[in-house]
């Protein structure tokens, strides 16, 4: 496939007032038209475990991603680690609704960043013609009060756009029930809802200045969304894209332990007084695990 997704965004000029301040931007249609092709929807199919009923079940989660590069074999998509965490299967949907299989390439759990790969051979030429590679901006140049635009797969319903301003810079957030705690974030009042994680936070030039990552959820709180600054992400992403893409291995070539299990979350450790590690939900008969004396539970 020779089609190249090399369109860059960021051609909208900003008006200067008194040579010092940007005018208030209310019409972002041209910025959005240019930027939407570089944002994708991500579906994560994973196995969840109900400790109360002692059973596994299939679950699906939705997020977003930003197309940041293309090489000879693949498109590279930046997203949050929590969007792809524990995935059995990943799927990416482009702006034209084409959906293809995706693979984890590199992850940085502590920084809540990940790079996902889509093989070019899996993407129809027609779809390649509709997508774009994002222009990355300079998050260090952001100022409180300037306009911001968030694009993402809100609630899993497909791409949507919200606007606001940069509310604060260098913010730290900590949630007691979350393993990931982030610092030096961008705060915006552009709505960031479930499914927006991994999507793009743009400036008025259409440049990606942040990766939408989280929102403080409380009935008394409005307009507090957070994004990882693109300048913070750059050196991490530079290393992640060098890693080998993790493709599925044929069943007959896989190592086989003989158990079904799931990681014990911090929430489960607290609620059920379980130790840290892997909870064994079943042991297959005749396997090495059974012979070693591993038991269910």
Task: Cite the ranges covered by each PLM segment.
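Serine-dependent protease modules
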Residues: 2-267, 275-276, 285
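Conserved PDZ fold ligand-binding element
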Residues: 77, 289-297
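Extended hydrophobic-aromatic, low-complexity segments
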Residues: 268-272, 290-293
């Amino acid at each position: 496939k020779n089609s190249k997704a090399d369109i860059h965004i960021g051609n909208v000029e900003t008006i200067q007032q008194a040579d010092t301040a940007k005018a208030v931007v209310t019409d972002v249609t041209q910025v959005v038209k240019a930027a939407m092709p570089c944002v994708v929807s991500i579906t994560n199919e994973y196995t969840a475990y109900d400790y109360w009923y002692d059973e596994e079940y299939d679950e699906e989660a939705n997020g977003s991603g930003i197309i940041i590069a293309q090489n000879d074999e693949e498109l590279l998509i930046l997203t949050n680690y929590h969007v792809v965490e524990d995935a059995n299967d990943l799927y990416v949907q482009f702006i034209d609704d084409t959906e293809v299989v995706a693979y984890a390439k590199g992850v940085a759990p502590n920084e809540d960043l990940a790079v996902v790969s889509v093989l070019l051979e899996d993407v129809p030429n027609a779809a390649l013609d509709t997508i774009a590679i994002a222009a990355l901006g300079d998050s260090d140049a952001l100022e409180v009060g300037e306009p911001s635009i968030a694009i993402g797969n809100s609630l899993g319903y497909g791409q949507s756009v919200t606007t606001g301003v940069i509310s604060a810079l260098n913010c730290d957030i900590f949630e007691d029930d979350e393993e990931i705690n982030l610092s030096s974030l961008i705060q915006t009042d552009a709505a960031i809802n479930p499914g927006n994680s991994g999507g793009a936070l743009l400036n008025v030039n259409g440049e990606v200045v942040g990766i939408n990552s989280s929102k403080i959820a409380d009935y008394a709180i409005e307009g507090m969304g957070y994004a990882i600054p693109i300048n913070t992400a750059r050196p991490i992403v530079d290393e992640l894209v060098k890693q080998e893409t993790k493709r599925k291995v044929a069943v007959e070539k896989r190592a086989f332990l003989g158990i079904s299990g799931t990681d014990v979350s911090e929430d489960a450790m607290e609620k059920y007084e379980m130790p840290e590690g892997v909870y064994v939900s079943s042991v297959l008969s005749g396997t090495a695990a059974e012979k070693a004396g591993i038991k269910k539970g």
